[in-house]
C-alpha cells in the first residue's frame, strides 16, 4: 500500500518447489505487518506439515492473483505428485488460478543464424553446415575424424539431472560406435571427483572428451556440432538444454518428465504428426531405459542417415521455446 501497489494484480512464477521459505512465525512480526496473527492460519501462511512454521511460498500462492510454473506438465506434477514438496493441497485449492506456461529461449543468444560463437552459421534450410561445426568441435576437443555420431551432455552434474545415467550414457555411446563429449560441473564434491576421475581415465580416448567446468563458447559449439544430446533428468520443471538442442537441429534424447514431455516428441512412439516428432524419449530411471532410446537414435544415424537428417530438420522446425 505504501508504494502504490494496493490495487495491482500479482502473478507469481515458481520454478523450483523445493525451496519454500519455511521459517518461524516471528518473521511476520519482524516484517511490521499489521495483525500478523491473522496470517498464521492453515488457509493462509501456516505450513501444512509444520504447524509451528510459516511457508512463504504457500503465502505467495494464496495471495497472488495468478500462479504459474514453467511448463504445463510440471504444473500437473506439482499438483498430483511428490514434486510439489507438500504444496499439492494448496495448489489444488487454488487450481483455478494456477497453470504452466512453457519457458522460452533468448533468440538473440541462441540462434544458429546469428550465433557469433560458432564457426559456421546455418539455418533450417542448410543444416548440412552442421558438419562444419562438427569438424570444428572435433578439432577443438581432439576427437578423431570418423564416421560416428557425436553425442553430448551439457549442464549441471547432480542427482536431479540423472548423473548415474549421464555416466552410463558415456559408456553406452563409446560401446555403440559413437563419440561422447561432456561440458559440466557439479556442486557435489563426490560427483565432481568422480567425473574428474572419468576425465583422466578417458584422457587419451580419441572418441571422448570431458570438460569439467563451464565455457560459454564451447557450449555453443557443442550444440552446433553434436548430432544428439542426452538429458536423462529425474525431474525437470522445463529444461533449456533440449530447447537449445532443438533450435540447433541437434536431436534430444530425454527422460519423459516435466517440460521435456511438453517439448520433445518421440520419433517412433509419439501420437504427434510425423513432422512434429523431434527426438527420443524414455521413462524409466534405470540404464535400460536410456539404452532403449539411445539404441534407436544411434541406429537411425548409422543405418538410415537420410531419415536422421529429416529428424534434425524436424527438430530445428520445432515450435517450442518461443
Predicted feature descriptions by range:
Residues 1-322:
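Catalytic cores of nucleotide-sugar-dependent glycosyltransferases that transfer UDP/GDP/TDP-activated
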Amino acid at each position: 500500500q505504501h508504494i502504490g501497489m494496493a490495487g495491482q494484480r500479482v502473478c507469481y512464477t515458481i520454478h523450483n518447489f523445493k525451496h519454500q521459505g519455511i521459517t518461524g512465525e516471528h518473521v511476520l512480526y519482524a516484517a511490521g505487518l499489521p495483525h500478523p496473527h491473522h496470517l498464521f492460519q492453515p488457509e493462509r501462511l501456516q505450513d501444512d506439515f509444520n504447524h509451528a512454521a510459516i511457508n512463504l511460498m504457500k503465502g505467495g500462492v494464496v495471495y497472488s492473483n495468478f500462479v504459474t510454473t514453467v511448463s504445463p506438465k510440471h504444473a500437473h506434477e506439482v499438483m498430483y505428485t511428490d514434486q510439489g514438496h507438500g504444496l499439492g493441497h494448496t495448489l489444488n485449492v487454488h487450481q483455478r488460478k494456477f497453470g504452466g506456461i512453457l519457458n522460452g529461449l533468448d533468440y538473440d543468444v541462441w540462434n544458429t543464424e546469428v550465433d557469433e560463437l560458432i564457426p559456421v552459421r546455418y539455418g533450417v534450410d542448410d543444416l548440412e553446415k552442421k558438419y562444419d561445426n562438427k569438424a570444428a568441435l572435433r578439432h577443438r576437443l581432439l576427437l578423431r575424424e570418423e564416421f560416428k555420431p557425436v553425442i553430448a551432455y551439457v549442464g549441471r552434474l547432480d542427482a536431479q539431472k540423472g548423473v548415474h545415467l549421464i555416466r552410463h550414457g558415456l559408456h553406452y555411446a563409446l560401446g555403440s560406435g559413437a563419440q561422447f563429449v561432456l561440458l559440466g560441473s557439479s556442486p557435489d564434491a563426490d560427483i565432481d571427483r568422480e567425473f574428474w576421475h572419468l576425465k583422466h581415465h578417458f584422457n587419451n580416448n580419441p572418441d571422448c572428451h570431458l570438460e569439467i567446468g563451464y565455457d560459454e563458447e564451447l557450449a555453443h559449439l557443442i550444440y552446433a556440432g553434436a548430432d544428439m544430446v542426452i538429458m536423462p533428468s529425474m525431474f525437470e520443471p522445463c529444461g533449456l538444454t533440449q530447447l537449445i538442442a532443438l533450435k540447433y537441429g541437434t536431436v534430444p534424447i530425454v527422460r519423459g518428465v516435466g517440460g521435456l514431455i511438453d517439448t520433445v516428441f518421440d520419433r517412433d512412439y509419439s501420437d504427434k504428426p510425423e513432422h512434429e516428432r523431434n527426438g527420443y524419449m524414455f521413462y524409466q530411471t534405470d540404464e535400460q531405459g536410456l539404452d532403449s532410446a539411445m539404441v534407436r537414435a544411434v541406429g537411425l544415424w548409422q543405418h538410415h542417415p537420410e531419415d536422421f537428417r529429416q529428424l534434425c530438420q524436424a527438430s530445428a522446425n520445432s515450435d517450442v521455446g518461443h
